[in-house]
Amino acid sequence: MASVAGDSAMEVVPALAEEAAAEATGPSCLVQLPGEVLEYILCSGSLTALDIGRVSSTCRRLREVCQSSGQVWKEQFRVRWPSLMKHYSPTDYVNWLEEYKVRQKAGLEARKIVASFSKRFFSEHVPCNGFSDIENLEGPEIFFEDELVCILNMEGRKALTWKYYAKKILYYLRQQKILNNLKAFLQQPDDYESYLEGAVYIDQYCNPLSDISFRDIQAQIHSIVELVCKTLRGINSRHPSLTFRAGESSMIMEIELQSQVLDAINYVLYDQLKFKGNRMDYYNALNLYMHQVLTRRTGIPISMSLLYLTVARQLGVPLEPVNFPSHFLLRWCQGAEGATLDIFDYIYIDAFGKGKQLTVKECEYLIGQHVTAALYGVVNVKKVLQRMVGNLLSLGKREGIDQSYQLLRDSLDLYLAMYPDQVQLLLLQARLYFHLGIWPEKSFCLVLKVLDILQHIQTLDPGQHGAVGYLVQHTLEHIERKKEEVGVEVKLRSEEKHRDVCYSIGLVMKHKRYGYNCVIYGWDPTCMMGHEWIRNMNVHSLPHGHHQPFYNVLVEDGSCRYAAQENLEYNVEPQEISHPDVGRYFSEFTGTHYIPNAELEIRYPEDLEFVYETVQNIYSAKEDTAE
């Protein structure tokens, strides 16, 4: 837990300590040293915040040194929370003692909320109102985010439940901020850099836990521009693009000079830096995230085009984006300025295909079909982002049934932020809530949100009456079921009906047939699934059929499965299970097994003792044999 050094700094200075200090004489007395020397000593790094608080309480002289210039507490702040220093300007006036106390208070409050989440939301997904506590906290948001990051960086195998909920809270807070920024961005007029900025917002929203900033992306692209300039200097040492300063929006109009820039771009991107279209793994969301495109040096047509466009326009070549079907392109005008132009007055650039320059006919060959002239037109920022998000939406729909549908949820949020009246997507969003079971614990704010969505759909398209009616009925039935729910079900191994249960929660197992590694987080004395599931999974073909214990397991591939006892065996080489929900059920991995968190232990109160016995018998025996 965070220390309380800030409180010590506020203690009243004892009168006797001041008198004793005043009577001291000679150069050996600490308080007689020059202030700069005292400050240097106190900032040396060997003293903790608690030490500084105690020093400040000894006499007025030392308290003044600690607080007057602020350097002492600034150093304590920097050492304790180094990642926050980037948010301060050297010219800002900051009361560092107060800043330290505010940050520490924010950390304590954030940890208190994180600690409460497991008890409140163990049985279901965190509801929409679940984050209201942290949204309503007073103090800078960056302080709360920083504390959540500190929790995530705790020792790898411990505090798993804290990390699980800290990650969810941080994910939510950052996405809300990014979505608000995106909505404000969409209200601004278009300019050439807007394409890149909009793409970075999409990247950030889908990867809120990654350290992605527009400034960093710009810096990486600027380094590419510098390489292009170096190549361009070898082609034409007097090229006007070489005199452009960063941030300028100047354009060169001569076709020959533009062509020289494009030749230099093609050489740097595709020959020198080895960028290429990702044909081998085309349907991968990483191909649409700009920070990944720059890191992995590969992408799909739209992301490669945005990179190419940004570099070209920074060097004065006015390329434009073309929302060509199945293959995003750029167009390069060959006509005279001010003349009436048609689609044949442009060359079309395929950034996915190493910057190849295409005619209209070659564009049709590229996709294997004839298209109308309208599809060769330039598109604005919003349309470009719509296509990017549409690609992510398609990928999200491909996610397996055992996944969290996080990409689908994120892309739906982004699409509806741009186009809030898309009826089919609103319906999909409502169905997704039902499928994932994202319901509130004590209130029905999310149910009401779904009902609002459905009412909005009905207003937009009365023809959807049937689908809306079904979902409304489903929602109201859920409300009634919530009212009838009973308390926590406790399963005792000692009960006669559980005598056949051989394994327990927290044990790392291996599936005999499929070979996957997993950890048990629940069990039933017999199969509790419906007849259809039993039939589809061919349970009757098992020697013991459905009349045997079944186990809920978290699998290393991210799926959750329901496995028969006869198909499981102890994993002789237990390893961590990299499943996103491990922290929901377990607090620690010991190296041989998982320790259930308080909420899971309430439901299986006798399992932990059995786990210890099993681990002792299985893994200790193995160690003895090895010796």
Swiss-Prot record:
Positions of disulphide bridges: none
Gene3D superfamilies noted in UniProt: 1.20.1280.50, Hemimethylated DNA-binding domain
Keyword Kinase: no
SUPFAM superfamilies, per database record: F-box domain (SSF81383), YccV-like (SSF141255)
Pfam family, one: F-box-like
GO molecular function: DNA binding
PANTHER family associated with the record: F-BOX ONLY PROTEIN 21, SI:DKEY-261L7.2
Quaternary structure and partners: Directly interacts with SKP1 and CUL1.
Function: Substrate-recognition component of the SCF (SKP1-CUL1-F-box protein)-type E3 ubiquitin ligase complex.
Name this polypeptide is given: F-box only protein 21
The species this protein was found in: Mus musculus
